[in-house]
A protein has these predicted regions:
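Active-site beta-loop-alpha junctions enriched in small/polar residues
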Residues: 7-11, 35-39, 75-78, 114-116, ...
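Glycine-rich, proline-tolerant flexible connector loops at the mouths of alpha/beta enzymes
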Residues: 33-60, 119
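Structured loop/turn residues at beta-strand edges in well-structured enzyme cores
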Residues: 27-30, 68, 104, 188, ...
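Hydrophobic faces of well-ordered beta-strands that scaffold small-molecule active sites
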Residues: 2-8, 32-34, 70-75, 109-111, ...
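N-terminal basic, low-complexity leaders that serve as flexible interaction/assembly modules and, when applicable
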Residues: 1-14, 25-26
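Gly/Pro-rich active-site loop or hairpin
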Residues: 13-14, 21, 43, 50, ...
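Catalytic domains of carbohydrate-active enzymes, especially glycoside hydrolases
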Residues: 17-39, 100-108
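Active-site acidic/histidine proton-transfer and metal-coordination neighborhood
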Residues: 57, 62-66, 81-191, 201
């Protein structure tokens, strides 16, 4: 079964969780991409509190009552690879996020690869960044099994404008990088999420990415933008056809 869902991350904090979900339902969507990432920060966010499980159960009851199943959710992306590339295990908030995803009745949890937030003119650091990510996601696999969740790895982009013209692509912006991460982790609990907007900003061929990923593609974030238009933030999440994605 395929669902057409909508995200609500851009407006959910301007109202209650229930009203934000009802807005998505009233717009005609049959499912929801729930922003656990938004509700996990800052420090007083619902997922940080002592009653976070109760909060998640309340969200699930709302989804059931209004008839809006949560078919995917987005994990936090607050962790980055340290400057000296020493390894750090996943923060505790990721375990909460994965359990909350299960409470919501959702199996597809979207993760960004963990990024190294420095300019990388060439690919010399790629092996260390790749090994770091493989190890990090390996640590999450027991939780994915415990909560019956599929980790969906989403292609990213140079959102901090660190790269300069002529530099190598940012890791995990290309189809091949993402496939190597999936194969490196080596688990049926890991698949791919294609964000068409991120791909467009990164100058990637979206249809070719779909063909390359084949059965590894589990979720699609279909959105548009104007491509790389630095120095502004390009990830506009426009409705398809309102940007320059072909």
């Amino acid at each position: 079964m395929h669902f057409i869902s909508s995200a609500m991350a851009s407006f959910c904090l301007e109202t209650t969780v229930e009203d934000a979900m009802q807005t998505v339902r009233d717009a005609g969507f049959d499912s929801l991409d729930f922003p656990l990432s938004v509700y996990s920060r800052p420090q007083d966010a619902p997922l940080r509190g002592d009653d976070w499980r109760q909060w998640a159960r309340g969200v699930r009851r709302t989804a059931d009552r209004i008839g809006l199943p949560i078919t995917q959710a987005h994990a936090s992306w607050e962790q980055a690879i340290p400057d000296d590339l020493h390894y750090e295990s996943p923060y505790e908030i990721y375990e909460r996020t994965m359990e909350a995803c299960a409470i919501l009745g959702c199996r597809q949890l979207i993760f960004h690869p963990v990024l190294y937030l420095h300019r990388m003119p060439d690919r010399s650091l790629w092996p260390r960044i790749h090994d770091w990510n493989v190890r990090w996601f390996h640590e999450l696999l027991p939780l994915a099994e415990k909560f019956d969740i599929v980790i969906n790895l989403e292609n990213t982009f140079d959102y901090r404008h660190l790269q300069q013209p002529g530099d190598a692509p940012v890791p995990y912006t290309t189809a091949q990088d993402m496939l190597e991460l999936v194969y490196g982790i080596g688990s049926n609990r890991v698949q791919l999420c294609l964000d068409t907007g991120h791909a467009h900003i990164s100058g990637q061929d979206v249809p070719e990415m779909i063909r390359a990923w084949r059965g590894n593609l589990a979720t699609l974030h279909l959105n548009d933008n104007y491509g790389l238009i630095r120095p502004v933030f390009e990830d506009l999440h426009l409705f398809p056809g309102y940007g320059t994605l072909e």
